[in-house]
Swiss-Prot record:
Alpha-D-glucose 1-phosphate binds at Y108, G173, E188, K189, S207. PANTHER family: GLUCOSE-1-PHOSPHATE ADENYLYLTRANSFERASE, GLUCOSE-1-PHOSPHATE ADENYLYLTRANSFERASE-RELATED. It comes from the Bacteria. One of its GO terms (biological process) is glycogen biosynthetic process. The keyword Magnesium does not apply. Its EC number is 2.7.7.27. This is Glucose-1-phosphate adenylyltransferase. Homotetramer. It holds the Pfam family NTP_transferase. Belongs to the bacterial/plant glucose-1-phosphate adenylyltransferase family. GO terms for molecular function: ATP binding; glucose-1-phosphate adenylyltransferase activity. Pathway: Glycan biosynthesis; glycogen biosynthesis. The lineage of its organism: Bacteria, Pseudomonadati, Pseudomonadota, Gammaproteobacteria, Thiotrichales.
Amino acid sequence: MDNHNSSHQLYKKAMALVLAGGRGSRLYNLTDTRAKPAVYFGGKFRIVDFALSNCLNSGIRRIGVVTQYKSHSLLRHIQRGWGFLRGELNEFIDLLPAQQRVDEESWYRGTADAVYQNIDILRSYGPEYVIVLAGDHIYKMDYSVMLRDHAQSGYKCTVGCVEIAEEEAYAFGIMGIDEDRKITSFIEKPKKNAPTIPGTTDRCYASMGIYIFNSDYLYDLLEEDIANKESSHDFGKDIIPRVVSENQALAHPFSMSCVPRGEGIEPYWRDVGTIDAFWEANLDLAANMPELNIYDKDWPVWTAQEQLPPAKFVPDRKGNHGVITNTLTSGGCIVLGSQISKSLMFSKVRVSAGCEIDQCVIMPEVVVGENCRLKKVVIDKGCDIPAGMVIGEDPIEDAKNFYRTDKGVVLVTKKMIDELKEK
């Protein structure tokens, strides 16, 4: 059987489970009203769209989305933008809120518990393989390649991993592997002595939060884990170390299945779990030749599409046309005679005359008043920035009025603006 037919048969036997219930507390006020996977990204998308699009483009069309924290906007987004799969062809996206399976007061207590609470639903669909995905990372990956790697290996679990510098290991689950890619150790967020990639002294393999299991093996692991009162019911802390101890875990480097892939191509994967990382990943897209290609017709990023008029750039009352460079602009935006560079504007943004905007991420329905100066600012949905406001130039004022990171990125939310107006 050739690889194409083999992959086709495999993805028909697989079901993906996207874990999209996380709060994302390191994004601070950006997740006050929404779960991290529902946060806006890239000018028109939500973070969860990348994992869901990877599923679709990989041929995986049986998908469960596990939700919990402030899930309304996420549920609405998926219902509006992802309702085109056809149930009569055994295609679906099943929305899975916490089942309170353990007791009537327990919500999801960890990533493994989130899957366990949906174990009956998984069994009812009868997949041979279960693909567990984090719903809060930015990347393009062909899961069918990883699935084929898993099926051909004979291992019962395969863990997607990305190469990182050793000094970054403290933030990830790090795996040690042998020359055949068998995982020999797995350490969650090591502070020192992280296992390095064979043949290197300063590079590590970090877990991407992507796992493929033989389904029966996964069910057994989850049922044993839930009975263990000492467990934190987490894949990285409990399940994967158990699999490694049983010699059943294979490492799958992201470079094998990233899109695109090939010699000289640097795989693009970002954990946008902090304001700085979120801002940087968005601004990556404003580069002349961005590392992440969102214009690839062969691997599109799907999302909910609101019917909006085209963006419009017009001169101000004095006839000043303004200058827009290296900026992504979505439908429904209107910009009057302003200078905007290296920025992203989501839908229905209004920028008044005389503004200077540099390296900003401006979410939907934001109104920027006249003569504002904004630099390195993330502006949440629905903010009304008063005329003449300056953000990003005075660290002390920024920290007093908004949330400012150590790297100088300023987060502005509607609540912050409203409180500032009341002073």
